[in-house]
């Protein structure tokens, strides 16, 4: 796991340098998630999970490519403070598409971090806006600002009846899943109300940081209506994965290295069922990133 930077900046540093510090934390969040092992159905240091088209090195290259775009999201967020927040998203889309193109170039066409570009792009734009407005930059204010950016997004994009439905529209109409859009529009409640307090509490208890993150991933998997899982396994696959994660948590979760045997077994089951909780992995990245925000003095 990447080390958490200690006291990365101070109040006298210039905005552009601050943006680089926040971008570095977001980059570390992506690396921390993919290096975390073992993760059920996901790419990690041990295997490629339920994926045949991507490997650990793809995620490392992708994170590096995305890293250089993150300050631009902050700059845009800072530049449009006179706009109502719900008007910001339209200007973020071209940045997001350009960042995606950089990701695809780095991975030779493999979609490693599209969900993280969406979530981290929103949060980085929120950082820029709040910094420019001299408002507090904290997990709660960032998620609330991201929610303001996404106001009406689910209705606009998922309730459309196109002749050719996107995967997200199909899952919304069939199963009522809103995916990354719904979580963002709601202000990341799975992170703010569940994952982040859980992770912080485990660290406060002295839990090993990697074990705490793995336990937090299980919590997210048990609660999240993960469209990545549903697109592969349908409602039954999603229900099975949520139940398996919940059972592990009820049995005590991941407290010691001895408990990793349960994750190895869960991983093999996910691989056999071709299930990958990529949406929960994206939310774990958000959780770790927000947990580090307080380290940056601004």
Swiss-Prot record:
Keywords: ATP-binding, Nucleotide-binding, Transferase. One of its GO terms (biological process) is prosthetic group biosynthetic process. It holds the Pfam family CitG. It is an enzyme of class 2 (transferase). One of its GO terms (molecular function) is ATP binding. It catalyses: 3'-dephospho-CoA + ATP = 2'-(5''-triphospho-alpha-D-ribosyl)-3'-dephospho-CoA + adenine. InterPro entries: CitG, TriPribosyl-deP-CoA_syn_CitG. Its EC number is 2.4.2.52. Belongs to the CitG/MdcB family. This is Probable 2-(5''-triphosphoribosyl)-3'-dephosphocoenzyme-A synthase 2. It comes from Salmonella typhimurium (strain LT2 / SGSC1412 / ATCC 700720).
């Amino acid at each position: 796991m990447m080390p958490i930077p200690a006291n990365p900046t101070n109040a006298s540093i210039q905005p552009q340098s601050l943006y680089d510090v926040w971008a570095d934390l977001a980059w570390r969040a992506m690396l921390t998630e993919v290096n975390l092992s073992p993760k059920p159905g996901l790419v990690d240091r041990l295997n490629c999970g339920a994926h045949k088209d991507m490997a650990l090195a793809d995620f490392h290259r992708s994170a590096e490519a995305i890293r250089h775009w993150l300050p631009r999201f902050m700059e845009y967020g800072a530049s449009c403070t006179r706009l109502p927040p719900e008007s910001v998203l339209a200007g973020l889309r071209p940045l997001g598409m350009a960042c995606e193109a950089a990701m695809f170039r780095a991975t030779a066409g493999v979609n490693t971090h599209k969900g993280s570009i969406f979530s981290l792009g929103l949060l980085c734009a929120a950082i820029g806006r709040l910094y420019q407005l001299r408002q507090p930059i904290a997990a709660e204010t960032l998620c609330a600002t991201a929610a303001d950016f996404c106001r009406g997004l689910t209705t606009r994009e998922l309730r459309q009846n196109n002749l050719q439905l996107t995967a997200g529209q199909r899952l919304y109409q069939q199963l009522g899943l809103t995916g990354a859009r719904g979580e963002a529009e709601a202000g990341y409640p799975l992170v703010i109300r569940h994952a982040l307090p859980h992770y912080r509490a485990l660290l406060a208890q002295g839990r090993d940081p990697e074990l705490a993150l793995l336990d937090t991933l299980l919590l997210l998997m048990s609660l999240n209506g993960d469209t990545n899982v549903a697109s592969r396994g349908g409602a039954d696959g999603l229900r099975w994965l949520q139940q398996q994660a919940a059972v592990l948590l009820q049995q005590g979760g991941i407290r010691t290295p001895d408990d990793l045997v349960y994750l190895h077994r869960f991983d093999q089951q996910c691989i056999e069922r071709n299930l990958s909780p990529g949406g929960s992995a994206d939310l774990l990245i958000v959780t770790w990133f927000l947990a580090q925000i307080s380290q940056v003095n601004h």
